[in-house]
Curated annotation (Swiss-Prot):
Gene3D superfamilies: Phosphoenolpyruvate-binding domains, Phosphohistidine domain, PtsI, HPr-binding domain. GO terms for biological process: phosphoenolpyruvate-dependent sugar phosphotransferase system. It catalyses: L-histidyl-[protein] + phosphoenolpyruvate = N(pros)-phospho-L-histidyl-[protein] + pyruvate. It comes from Listeria innocua serovar 6a (strain ATCC BAA-680 / CLIP 11262). This is Phosphoenolpyruvate-protein phosphotransferase.
């Protein structure tokens, strides 16, 4: 008998295949006393070394298949494995308590996990998740237990799991894994974001799929509407095969728009750009008809290594992207380290809330030579195309002036040395701190453009960590307060003859696109896989009608009212 579950549509598409259950292995053990503590310590160190080798291999595969930005999660896992503040106490526990390595590992990591999970900020809670993932891997090697390896799947399946860890997702082979469904998670969870990168259908947050599915059960995953059907009838299979076929035809239609400009029904042009992390991501931008790079996250050039990239290394990477876009705009964000992004070779202070602390431009000002090195590389690359530079985490006008003055100083030095530098580089800022949005009219007199980073802007405005399930209901992209801030920024830029882009998740959200078009957004920067779908939508919209929609939305009281309004407008 067919059973239907409802979850959250995380990645578009339809998948119909038998289930592959990614279940947790039995890692139970007995606490024992050891007599040869040195041998036990060596057994623990051996398990650490095997785990390091495995994670390094997984990281390389993730970088190749998903891009460097997605692979950097494994740098955090490798940091855990190499952290003497964690491994040291485990070895001391073995020696002092004469306990087996499994017990020492479990008890020591439990202490760290409990400490991190009790903290209020997202960064620290993510460290707890990293420790859990690493502990499972090390424990499996101590016990000689095989962890299910999704990379070994060699037939067409849909993966069913309580949740997917970064390690799991990075090993999914798109040739065989046609989709996945999980018990937990939301649209902005790690597994959902990875599914969109892999371009495979996914439904998350079903709550009970693992309790409802057995190995080899036929499962339908509807990543368009968030439906999951177990033991579907022939009629249901036929119905979803038709939807799958129609969606494939729809994608083929979108593909025809690849070389077209993004113009609304009434002739208003906006730019659809892509977010990238490395030069390797350019292929996806070009194949999906990206009109620009709206966000080049340069921090990924600094990750997965043991030291800072040299000026020459950075120059080559920036040159590759700028020249590769063949004259199209490339907006480069300067180094955004701190918060949830760390470097193993850069010591950062311990902070109660690193997301509100020493990060991004603040860190660059305190490490000025590091900042200057990056700016020199960018300035040298500017002659190879249409480079724009923006500074992250700007809160005050003085911060922008300080960053600009450092850049102009480096530009003058390069020119004095005979190095060619473009004189038409636009300078902008990320709008992710509410203070910058409120003061946009003053910023607009000095910057060339704004790029709204909605992920942080929403969190800071609503005082709600989107990864904290207890307050995630407050992470509301459609809250009128957020829309008013966006409108304020766009209007301020236009008043001064400047432009505004958006590079957060909201820019590629199909519910948000009509609103943003009506609010006057000039550039939408999103994952490359969302570009053609968004272009198709905008071509069907009348911008003058969307202006009316946006005006109505700004006067609503709740996010729910705004969503209802958009659905009503787009259905007509």
């Amino acid at each position: 008998m067919a059973k239907e579950l409802k979850g959250i549509a995380a990645s578009d598409g339809i998948a119909i295949a038998k289930a592959y259950l990614l279940v947790e292995p039995d890692l139970s053990y007995e606490k024992t006393e050891v007599t040869d503590v040195e041998s036990e310590v060596k057994r623990f160190e051996s398990a650490l070394e095997v785990s390091r080798t495995e994670l390094s291999t997984i990281r390389e595969k993730a970088a190749k298949d998903l891009g460097e930005d997605k692979a950097q999660i494994f740098d955090a896992h490798l940091l855990v494995l190499n952290d003497p503040e964690l491994t040291g106490p485990i070895e001391e526990s073995i020696k002092n308590a004469k306990t087996n390595a499994e017990t020492a590992l479990q008890e020591t990591t439990d202490m760290f996990i409990g400490m991190f999970e009790s903290m209020d900020n997202e960064y620290m809670r993510e460290r707890a998740a990293d420790i859990k993932d690493v502990r499972k891997r090390v424990l499996s090697h101590l016990l000689g237990v095989t962890i299910p390896n999704p990379a070994l799947i060699d037939e067409e399946v849909v993966v069913v799991a309580a949740d997917l860890t970064p390690s799991d997702t990075a090993q999914l082979n798109r040739k065989f894994v046609k989709g996945f469904v999980t018990d937990i998670g939301g649209r902005t969870s790690h597994s959902a974001i990875m599914a969109r990168s892999l371009e495979i259908p996914a439904v998350v947050g079903t709550k009970e799929v693992t309790a409802s599915v057995a190995k080899n059960d036929i499962v339908i995953i509807d990543g368009l509407e968030g439906n999951v059907i177990i033991h579907p009838t022939e009629e249901q299979i036929a119905h979803y095969e038709k939807i799958k076929s129609d969606f494939a035809l729809q994608q083929a239609e979108w593909e025809k728009l690849k070389n077209e400009k993004t113009v609304s029904k009434d002739g208003v042009h906006v730019e659809l750009a892509a977010n990238i992390g490395t030069p390797n991501d350019l292929e996806g931008v070009i194949s999906n008809g990206g009109e620009a790079v709206g966000l080049y996250r340069t921090e990924f050039l600094y990750m997965g290594r043991d030291n800072f990239p040299t000026e020459e290394e950075q120059f080559e990477a920036y040159k590759a992207v700028v020249s590769g876009m063949d004259g199209k705009s490339v907006v480069v964000r300067t180094l955004d380290i701190g918060g949830d992004k760390t470097l193993p070779y850069l010591e950062l202070p311990e902070e109660m809330n690193p997301f509100l602390g020493f990060r991004a431009i603040r860190l660059c000002f305190a490490n000025e030579e590091l900042f200057r090195t990056q700016l020199r590389a960018l300035l040298r690359a500017s002659v190879y195309g249409n480079l724009k530079i923006m500074f992250p985490m700007i809160a005050t006008v003085n911060e922008f002036r300080q960053a600009r003055d450092i850049l102009l100083d480096e530009k003058a030095k390069l020119k004095a040395a005979g190095t060619e530098v473009s004189d038409s580089i636009e300078l902008g800022i990320m709008i992710e701190i509410p203070a910058a949005a409120v003061l946009a009219d003053q910023f607009a007199k000095e910057v060339d453009f704004f790029s709204i980073g909605t992920n942080d802007l929403i969190q800071y405005t609503m005082a709600a960590d989107r990864m904290n399930e207890r307050v995630s209901y407050l992470y509301q992209p459609y809250n009128p307060s957020i829309l008013r801030l966006v409108k304020m920024v766009i209007d301020a830029s236009h008043k001064e003859g400047k432009w505004t882009g958006m590079c957060g998740e909201m820019a590629g959200d199909q519910t948000a696109v009509p609103l943003l078009l009506g609010l006057g957004l000039d550039e939408f920067s999103m994952s490359a896989s969302s570009i053609l779908k968004s272009r198709s939508l905008i071509k069907r919209l009348d911008q003058s009608e969307m202006v009316k929609l946006a005006e109505e939305a700004l006067n609503k009281s709740t996010a729910e009212e705004v969503v209802e309004l958009v659905e009503k407008y787009t259905a007509e």
